[in-house]
């Protein structure tokens, strides 16, 4: 039993051991499978990482190649642009060379043509003189008497003389002194003509034609063949008389023709055996330099005498030929050949401009680049500074040309006479301003500061050069004018601060310092009209009409400077009431002392007002000016007040 028992236990134990072994194998296999699976997963992950790394490397390589390609494209484009610029420069250089050659060829042809024409003029003058010398000795006295009478009739008709010529019958009965008397009358007539017409007046076409007829008649008389011996009653007259008369007549006609520029001045005068009558015109001033010119050492251009060296082109410095006079260009910078002027820049002296800007009033041409290259521009007349000239810089950065500088009003004390004259001007228009308030000149910064404190907000593109104040504020005014120092620098200017108080509706009028008297006066007239309106309680007017009436007053004041006469002040009040378009004379105009530039500047200021295209000042002036033209200043003012 015991053995059986033990036997059965052994079998059970063996089965257990077998089961345990089977379970261990299964677990071992499971673990093995898991390990294999994990290994395979690791391998897959490694492959994926390797593939990702490879893809990243490929992407980096592609990016690098793309960057290299972009760099190559940029380099190629840069080279293409440089090549294009090089080709453009070569084309421009070729074009410039071609233009230079073309210009030189044109100048050569012009010079050749001018030389030929000058030679023809000289040949014509010499031929005429030789003809006069050879033929004036071949005329008979009786036939010359007839011609003299015809000449006297034509000259008297030309000069509107009241005396009548000596008749043929009377002429024959006069002693040997008679022919000389007739010639003296003719010489006096020609001399009077030279005096009256040789001082800056252009001859009328009708007068030129008559003088040409006169020359033809003289030439006809000189070309006559020699006639039979003289009449018996004239045998006692010297054979020298007709010759002297012919030479006098020929010389008078030649001088007349020279005065019209039809023949050139010749150094060789017609020579005669006897004494010739002198027909020298009175001393005159050169139209260019204003110095005296001597008879025989000048050229007569449209009735004005010039030194030969003064009537030259400002661009090429060559004389302007007589046949080019009608086509030459003249402006404030000088005179020019028309061909030179079309290509000449007055700023940099460039003589071959391809494109140009042109000032609408001064008609001065300049290269467009000078508008933006820092070339100074006068704050008054708007002209650019030519090279080799020095504009003056004011303390606030504005530029002033030397012509405007000559009449500039520089400090507050200096402008007071103009202030008093302006009050007289307004009183003459029946618009007397009773209240007193200061008139101060200030720098640009002080004017801008006052404008802000006055709370003036201009919504238009305008340059403020004056302001009529209504509020109390502290103003820095120019108390001591600067003086011109070395190199046209302004030194010594002083300013002082003062408080303007409100004693009436106007506390002060401020205007930029350093402007010419004419421009300062126009601005003052404009601001004084604002003051007149405020002092009379006229506020909140239509802005366009208010600025328009102020511009009209400025324009009227400029008119008074242009047309003022010495006796106009006496009837200023009656003129204002009867005709508003005839302003009273301003006592400080001093028109007789004006320079040519001042006369041009007043026209420039008027032109600026008339051509202003701004929506308030320009439109306002044209609207109100038409109203004043159709009625009167006082009626226009009433209409403006009704339209507030």
Curated annotation (Swiss-Prot):
InterPro entries noted in UniProt: DA1-like, DA1-like_dom, UIM_dom, Znf_LIM
One of the record's GO molecular function terms: ubiquitin binding
Signal peptide: none
UniProt biased composition (Low complexity): 572-589
Keyword Amino-acid biosynthesis: no
Annotated disulfide bonds: none
Keywords: LIM domain, Metal-binding, Repeat, Zinc
Top-level taxon of the source organism: Eukaryota
Entry keyword annotation includes Iron: no
Limits of the LIM zinc-binding domain: 284-355
All residue ranges annotated as the UIM domain in the record: 119-138, 181-200, 244-263
Region (Disordered): 572-591
Quaternary context: Interacts with ubiquitin.
Its job: Ubiquitin receptor that probably regulates developmental process.
Domain text: The UIM domains bind molecules modified by monoubiquitin or ubiquitin chains and promote coupled monoubiquitination.
Protein name per its UniProtKB record: Protein DA1-related 6
Source organism: Arabidopsis thaliana
